[in-house]
From Swiss-Prot:
Chief subcellular location: cytoplasm
Gene symbol of the encoding locus: EIF4EBP2
Protein's recorded name: Eukaryotic translation initiation factor 4E-binding protein 2
Motif annotated as Secondary EIF4E binding site, chain positions: 78-82
Keywords: Cytoplasm, Nucleus, Phosphoprotein, Protein synthesis inhibitor, Translation regulation
Top-level taxon in the UniProt lineage: Eukaryota
PANTHER family named among the record's database cross-references: EUKARYOTIC TRANSLATION INITIATION FACTOR 4E-BINDING PROTEIN, EUKARYOTIC TRANSLATION INITIATION FACTOR 4E-BINDING PROTEIN 2
Function: Repressor of translation initiation involved in synaptic plasticity, learning and memory formation. Regulates EIF4E activity by preventing its assembly into the eIF4F complex: hypophosphorylated form of EIF4EBP2 competes with EIF4G1/EIF4G3 and strongly binds to EIF4E, leading to repress translation. In contrast, hyperphosphorylated form dissociates from EIF4E, allowing interaction between EIF4G1/EIF4G3 and EIF4E, leading to initiation of translation.
Length: 120
């Protein structure tokens, strides 16, 4: 049997991927899950597999929206991060704890205890 490159197979024609631009007027229309490409482009996919790519101008416009300036709901209480004013008090307590630990470490001679145990 011999085969040749021209045995009835035609090379497929290349086609452009169909795209369309949809203007979104409300941030609530954005999906909840995003993905990124190695180049940093943000995109999302629909349940049907359609990829939605967000351009830079659109995302920069949304950065200054009132919704972007509002913290998310149901945020945990993290002192100094989500609740202001407690960072100074907590940092003083933390510094005192570090000083106590350093004083405790100085009481032991260097090399008394093994850093970790290893079974051979």
């Amino acid at each position: 049997m011999s085969s040749s490159a021209g045995s009835g197979h035609q090379p497929s024609q290349s086609r452009a991927i169909p795209t369309r631009t949809v203007a979104i007027s409300d941030a609530a229309q954005l999906p909840h899950d995003y993905c990124t490409t190695p180049g940093g482009t943000l995109f999302s996919t629909t349940p049907g597999g359609t990829r939605i790519i967000y351009d830079r101008k659109f995302l920069l416009d949304r950065r200054n929206s009132p919704m972007a300036q509002t913290p998310p709901c149901h945020l945990p209480n993290i002192p100094g991060v989500t609740s202001p004013g407690t960072l100074i008090e907590d940092s003083k307590v933390e510094v005192n704890n570090l000083n106590n630990l350093n004083n405790h470490d100085r009481k032991h001679a260097v090399g008394d205890d093994a850093q970790f145990e290893m079974d051979i």
